[in-house]
Amino acid sequence: MAQHQVNYASNAGLPVALTTVDKLVNWGRTNSLWVLTYGLACCAIEMMASGASRYDFDRFGVIFRASPRQSDVMIVAGTLTKKHAEFIRRLYDQMAEPKWVISMGSCANTGGMFNTYATVQGVDRVIPVDIYLPGCAPRPETLQYAVMLLQKKLRKRSIFQKQKPKRLV
């Protein structure tokens, strides 16, 4: 959790918290990430395990959503085929700004061992990716670490300036 200094000013005996709009909005975004899951292969099993009681994504403020219009983050887990490419782009375009993408697993990152005419060699050829998770299949702890990296990125973000996407991992 982020530790921000909050200044309290006394106004007619009532405590008033003073902070910047950036910190307030970033706090809200950091602690309420709504994730659109796009599981295509074995990595989706690990993604589902991260939402179960043993790893409990809810404590990070992560809620899995089924609608792209209600999501901030898209997690792509598995091999992306050319037939899925148009569909995943449409889902990405339906997400509200600001939006982030996590590419989970070797197949989503680079196409994995499938170098065929039907496979897209990385999700980043279709949509911009913020965080790459290596492995086959990455453990739920790795996905939790990626979410914590994304939260760290969101805490530093300014809401008034358009920032270029920067890869974290």
From Swiss-Prot:
Superkingdom, natural source: Bacteria
Major location category of this protein: membrane
Name of the gene this protein is made from: nuoB
One CC-aspect GO term: plasma membrane
Catalysed reactions listed for this entry: a quinone + NADH + 5 H(+)(in) = a quinol + NAD(+) + 4 H(+)(out)
Membrane topology: Peripheral membrane protein
Species annotation: Nitratiruptor sp. (strain SB155-2)
Protein name: NADH-quinone oxidoreductase subunit B
Gene3D superfamilies reported for this sequence: 3.40.50.12280
Similarity remark: Belongs to the complex I 20 kDa subunit family.
Function (record text): NDH-1 shuttles electrons from NADH, via FMN and iron-sulfur (Fe-S) centers, to quinones in the respiratory chain. The immediate electron acceptor for the enzyme in this species is believed to be ubiquinone. Couples the redox reaction to proton translocation (for every two electrons transferred, four hydrogen ions are translocated across the cytoplasmic membrane), and thus conserves the redox energy in a proton gradient.
Cofactor: [4Fe-4S] cluster
